[in-house]
């Protein structure tokens, strides 16, 4: 089934890449991936250790929180065979494990050590021949027993084993199993002295790495620092000296992992943090590279393949990402090259464009046109050559499309065509077409152009002779010229001006001129769109992507029937502003003073320091969009950069498909099933402010769409089926609430090919209706439910706010921006959930003080008020059996309550409490009727808690049993679908079949 969970374990070896994914362990190699035979009972895989190879066999030790497993790996010419041979438990958390090569060890026995979080060391031996129990040879303890968060073991024999740990107080602790101070032969227990205690950090130490040859030790911590230490020892570890060198700060959150890299006799340090960034440092502490790798998810582990020189990382979403460092750490290739100057000290390139992969043209400060050829060999210096017979006048615009070069100035336009064979620039046109100073020249195609000037005069020109095709009337603004243009069809033209307005024009039937039909003000603020990209076009509408000076892509919908333009969707991206979208996967833009290339599949591909986005620059993609060339002007000099966008990673990763699940907690989940399909789609939302649409197919997930309408955490959502416009598509209205008192309403359509279309309908801020009219208090909206009226376009929306208000609104699709408050009730407690019972016309409300309310449709009548728990009710599920309402609830009091309410007289007919099932707050439960019968005698329940244990309860006999556990940390809820699948969500997602756990 599906598992998206933390990947805490990562081990790089010649045999492949081992990843601990939740309670599973996967081996990635050049062969198809192998899932190891692991049967952990409660934990997540935290680490691995390999033994040496003997007689084509080796042992793999795998450990979780307090469990460990031994797996025999038999190597053959065809493939490796893995067999689980032993499982064990410890009483304390396991921090590290290591196989040893002691001198008195026999070939049939393997010795290893397990280090636990209170500085205890288990020295054990396993007999390969008998598959018997592991024998404890020694229990070693340190005189210090503080709580340890990370341990690094060093040594090949037990008598010379060094233990370097970091504790919760930021101290670095070192001890060695060589000279015990206390010994108990009966219990094989020995105590060893602490050799070093060093105050290292102002927080928990999360990782330690050292290299004795380089005399370098590195630690990371909660304090966001990467600290370098000098480590020296002349003999055993009693002679060790560790002295601080310097601290490096490049992360904005906790630094969770670190590795030391050796590349071409140079030493580097790589660190990964909760901010999803990987920083690469030189041995002197210089930050060489900072790159976001995991789409915003916290990075838990780093691993380095010395042979392939690839840095791997794992994250909270379970993704494994590899980055080839061969070129990344090659200084000439990660920095821009300064091209030669023009020769005259008073003349410089002030604007430039790529003509092809090798030729760059530049417009000089003296309004002369130059060109240069970029050699593949960086050792060859480029030369700027002046274009002969170039008309002399002051230029304001330089644009290039294929081999056509356009230069413009006051009223005048000049076109040249570059001949790749002769290197000649043929003049195609030179003449006056405009009234003022030309500010914009847009290539709509190779022979159609849109030109605008500072007076608002705009023309659509065609052919290389610039014949006037039509006049276009622009807004009479201070800066009316065009920044982006798209000819959608022969009838429709989309323009964006310098002041931020986007305008839709339609060609007049009486003339060839275009008339303004619709507009959107300040689509990307007051700086205008930088580009339009046509995504789809049919007889009814067109979909267009727009990017500008903000961290969002906007998706526009053009409807031809009434010539209207609207924003259908937005998408948040990790760029300060967007400049171009040259391919489906690639977005180019700026962050602060860097040019950034961002990939939907690979996250940040490039961060090139250029000085900021205000300067003139251009780009070129080549080699199948895999190589990016960038040229820009800085301080009157031209800089050039060229490198591969996508790092070549070895074939061990070629078949790994990364998941696109939430990088923060998932708070709510709903299942929807399109018509004529059996597998459901998942609607999910969480702390990353994103609503995701994910298709479930067999045992895999495929993300289909995202909604970025929320500005804060999404707490709850509902999907209401809505009538579609015929065809095979299915449509839902999605209502969602969360932080900043925001209610968002969107439309989701899924066609027969499973393509999703999102349309953001409206967004509302629901202020406290009891406060003053000038109040700006924004209470978090905790829950929502929606009822569709008999009139299909009219809806009742029930919203529960963190201020204690339950509000009833009327909303109509025809007027989406209007929200009519009908009534509200203040229950004086924070509501945690609401649920509409359609068959009874009743709204069920659960609260933080353990009460459940039943309200009528208008919220004016309270049917009942029951005290079910002594603390908050975190989760609730119901089942209606004629006049009986079955309520199953779980709360902070760690108990589960089963209540049967008679709705005829509102009397409680049965109330059962299940104690002792869980030892943490209960956040997930569901009532299950396996035969789909209405008979309450066949009701069962499944429950889950923060302790991750899953229980099954027979609600008729009240017997229960533990049936499994989930890997999902901080479980927020669970659902059951028609295929008997359970969905657990929280910090990840896990699906499992009921039949597999019974």
Swiss-Prot record:
Which GO terms of the molecular function aspect are on file?
enzyme regulator activity; RNA binding; tRNA binding
Q: What does this protein do?
A: Together with methyltransferase Trm7-34, methylates the 2'-O-ribose of nucleotides at position 34 of the anticodon loop of substrate tRNAs.
**InterPro entries referenced in this protein's UniProt entry, alphabetically:** tRNA_Anticodon_Mtase-Reg (IPR051973), WD40/YVTN_repeat-like_dom_sf (IPR015943), WD40_repeat_CS (IPR019775), WD40_repeat_dom_sf (IPR036322), WD40_rpt (IPR001680)
The record's annotation in PROSITE patterns points to:
WD_REPEATS_1 (PS00678), WD_REPEATS_2 (PS50082), WD_REPEATS_REGION (PS50294)
Q: Where is the protein situated, by its record's location annotation? A: Cytoplasm
Which family does the record claim for this protein? Belongs to the WD repeat WDR6 family.
WD repeat segments run 148-185, 200-239, 250-291, 294-333, 476-515, 527-566, 567-608, 664-704, 779-821, 826-865, 868-911
Name the record gives this protein: tRNA (34-2'-O)-methyltransferase regulator WDR6
What are the recorded Gene Ontology BP terms? negative regulation of cell population proliferation; tRNA methylation; wobble position ribose methylation
- Main subcellular location: cytoplasm
Which keywords appear in this protein's UniProt record, sorted alphabetically?
Cytoplasm, Repeat, tRNA processing, WD repeat
Disrupted gene: resulting phenotype? RNAi-mediated knockdown impairs small interfering RNA-mediated silencing and leads to derepression of piRNA pathway-mediated transposable element silencing.
Q: Cellular component terms, GO, for this chain's entry?
A: cytoplasm
How is this protein organized at the quaternary level? Interacts with Trm7-34.
Query: What's the superkingdom here?
Result: Eukaryota
């Amino acid at each position: 089934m599906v598992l998206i969970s933390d990947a805490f374990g990562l081990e790089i070896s010649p045999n492949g890449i081992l990843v601990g994914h939740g309670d599973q362990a996967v081996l990635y190699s050049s062969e198809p991936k192998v899932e190891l035979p692991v049967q952990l009972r409660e934990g997540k895989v935290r680490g691995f250790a390999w033994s040496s190879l003997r007689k084509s066999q080796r042992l793999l030790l795998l450990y979780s929180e307090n469990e460990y497993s031994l797996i025999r790996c038999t190597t053959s010419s065809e493939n490796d065979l893995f067999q689980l041979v032993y499982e064990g438990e410890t009483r304390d958390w396991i921090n590290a494990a290591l196989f040893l090569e002691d001198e008195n060890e026999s070939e049939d026995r393997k010795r290893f050590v397990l280090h636990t979080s209170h500085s205890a060391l288990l020295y054990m031996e396993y007999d390969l021949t008998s598959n018997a129990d592991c024998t404890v040879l020694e229990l070693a303890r340190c005189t210090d027993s503080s709580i340890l968060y990370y341990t690094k073991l060093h040594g090949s024999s037990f008598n010379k084993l060094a233990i370097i740990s970091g504790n919760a107080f930021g101290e670095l602790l070192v001890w060695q199993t060589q000279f015990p101070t206390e010994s108990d032969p009966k219990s094989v227990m020995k105590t060893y002295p602490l050799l070093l205690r060093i105050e290292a950090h102002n927080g928990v130490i999360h990782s330690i790495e050292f290299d004795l040859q380089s005399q370098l030790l590195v630690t990371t911590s909660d304090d966001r620092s990467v600290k370098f230490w000098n480590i020296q020892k002349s003999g055993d570890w009693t002679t060790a000296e560790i002295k601080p060198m310097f601290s490096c700060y490049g992360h904005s959150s906790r630094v969770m992992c670190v590795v030391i890299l050796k590349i071409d006799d140079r030493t580097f340090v790589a660190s990964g943090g909760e901010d999803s960034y990987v920083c690469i440092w030189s041995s002197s502490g210089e930050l060489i590279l900072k790159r976001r790798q995991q789409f915003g998810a916290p990075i838990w582990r780093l691993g380095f393949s010395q042979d392939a020189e690839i840095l791997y990382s794992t994250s909270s979403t379970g993704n494994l990402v590899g980055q080839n460092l061969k070129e990344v750490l090659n200084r000439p290739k990660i920095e821009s090259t300064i091209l030669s100057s023009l020769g005259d000290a008073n003349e410089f390139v002030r604007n430039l464009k790529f003509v092809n992969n090798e030729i760059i043209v530049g417009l000089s400060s003296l309004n002369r046109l130059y060109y240069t050829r970029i050699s593949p060999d960086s050792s060859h210096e480029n030369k700027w050559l002046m274009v002969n017979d170039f008309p002399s006048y002051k230029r304001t615009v330089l644009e290039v499309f294929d081999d056509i070069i356009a230069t413009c100035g006051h009223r005048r336009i000049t076109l040249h065509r570059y001949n790749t064979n002769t290197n000649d620039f043929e003049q195609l046109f030179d003449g006056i077409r405009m009234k003022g100073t030309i500010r914009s020249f847009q290539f709509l195609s190779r022979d159609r152009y849109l030109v605008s000037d500072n007076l608002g005069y705009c023309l659509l020109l065609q052919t290389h002779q610039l014949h006037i095709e039509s006049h276009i009337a622009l807004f009479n603004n201070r800066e009316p010229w065009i920044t982006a243009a798209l000819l959608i069809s022969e009838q429709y033209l989309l323009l964006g001006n310098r002041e931020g307005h986007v305008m839709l024009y339609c060609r007049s039937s009486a003339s060839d001129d275009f008339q303004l039909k619709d507009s959107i003000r300040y689509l990307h603020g007051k700086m205008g769109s930088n580009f339009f990209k046509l995504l789809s076009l049919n007889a009814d509408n067109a979909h267009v992507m727009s990017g500008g000076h903000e961290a969002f892509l906007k998706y526009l919908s053009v409807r031809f029937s009434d010539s209207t333009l609207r924003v259908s969707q937005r998408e948040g991206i990790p760029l300060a502003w967007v400049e171009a979208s040259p391919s489906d996967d690639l977005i180019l833009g700026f962050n602060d003073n860097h040019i950034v290339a961002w990939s939907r599949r690979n996250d940040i591909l490039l961060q090139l320091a250029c000085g900021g986005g205000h300067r003139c620059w251009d780009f070129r993609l080549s080699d199948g969009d895999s190589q990016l060339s960038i040229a820009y002007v800085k301080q009157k000099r031209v800089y050039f950069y060229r490198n591969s966008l996508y790092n070549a990673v070895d074939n061990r990763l070629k078949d790994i498909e990364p998941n696109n699940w939430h990088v923060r907690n998932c708070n709510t989940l709903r299942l929807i099933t399109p018509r004529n399909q059996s597998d459901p789609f998942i609607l999910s939302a969480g702390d990353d402010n994103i609503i995701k649409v994910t298709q479930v197919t067999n045992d895999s997930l495929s993300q289909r769409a995202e909604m970025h309408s929320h500005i804060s955490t999404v707490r709850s959502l509902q999907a209401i089926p809505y009538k579609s416009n015929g065809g095979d598509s299915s449509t839902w209205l999605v209502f969602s609430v969360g932080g900043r008192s925001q209610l968002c309403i969107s439309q989701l359509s899924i066609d027969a090919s499973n393509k999703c279309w999102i349309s953001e309908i409206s967004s509302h801020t629901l202020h406290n209706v009891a406060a003053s009219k000038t109040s700006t208090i924004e209470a978090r909206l905790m829950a929502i439910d929606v009822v569709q009226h008999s009139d299909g376009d009219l809806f009742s929306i029930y919203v529960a706010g963190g201020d204690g208000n339950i509000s009833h609104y009327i909303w109509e699709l025809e007027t989406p921006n209007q929200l009519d408050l009908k009534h509200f009730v203040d229950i004086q407690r924070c509501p945690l959930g609401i649920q509409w019972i359609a068959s009874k016309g009743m709204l069920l409300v659960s609260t933080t003080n353990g009460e459940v309310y039943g309200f009528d449709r208008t919220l004016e009548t309270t049917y009942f008020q029951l005290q079910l728990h002594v603390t908050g009710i975190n989760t609730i599920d119901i089942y209606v059996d004629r006049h009986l309402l079955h309520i199953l609830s779980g709360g902070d009091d760690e108990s589960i309550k089963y209540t049967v309410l008679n709705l005829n007289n509102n009397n409680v007919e049965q109330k059962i409490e299940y104690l002792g099932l869980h030892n943490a707050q209960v956040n997930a439960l569901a009532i299950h009727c396996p035969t789909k019968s209405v008979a309450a005698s066949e009701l069962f329940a499944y429950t889950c808690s923060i302790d991750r244990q899953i229980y099954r309860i027979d609600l008729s006999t009240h017997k229960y049993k533990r049936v499994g556990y989930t890997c999902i940390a901080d479980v927020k809820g669970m659902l059951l679908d028609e295929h008997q699948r359970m969905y657990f969500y929280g910090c990840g997602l896990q699906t499992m079949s009921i039949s597999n756990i019974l």
